[in-house]
Amino acid sequence: MRYKKYFRKTSLKQKGVGDFFLNEVKKKSPKIFLEVGVFHGVTARNVCELLYKIHKNDFKYIGLDLFEENNENKSEVIPSTLFSNPLKNIYFKYIKKQNPYSLEAVADFLKKFKDNVNLIKGNSKSVLKKIDMSKIDYVFLDGGHSYSTVKNDLECCLEVVLSNGTIMCDDYNFGHLPDVKNAIDEFVKNNKLNCRIICDGRFAKIEK
């Protein structure tokens, strides 16, 4: 299955990366998928399309994000929410009349799967601990990139791996900011888990 960009911004924009990611998800064919760091919802839409092909309506997607730029994420490394393509700025500002990073815009973008999707607005440090991880099959971590945030997100999702699920972490080789790699390496070592670094160092795939 090909990864589509849907005229929006996505962190998986590099050639072949999105396709590689979807192929990894397809291998596990999860029924309940959690994404931390939804951004414009492009990966969410691709995952929902894939899971619908596999399971029809028998799947759930949970997406967590702050859905706005504020004091809670100003210290984090997040993709720019501004488009370099002026046509995209015109499209969202004057035609859609939406901020593509807002909860409302992402919900509208995913409305095809509204019965399968649960979008949660909030900080992962407070929200993840409230989610029943025993139900989750697959986690895609692409939220905050600080050491403390990645450490928290991984620890909150540990039960997923212990229940034979998968945690896929983005930006493992985030060269100029090693916090992501350091937090992942420590988490894997402390919990004696298996971790494969794949897609030329882009992803860390953590399993039991």
Task: Specify the residue positions occupied by each region the protein language model found.
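S-adenosylmethionine/decaboxylated-SAM
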Residues: R2-S11, K15-K208
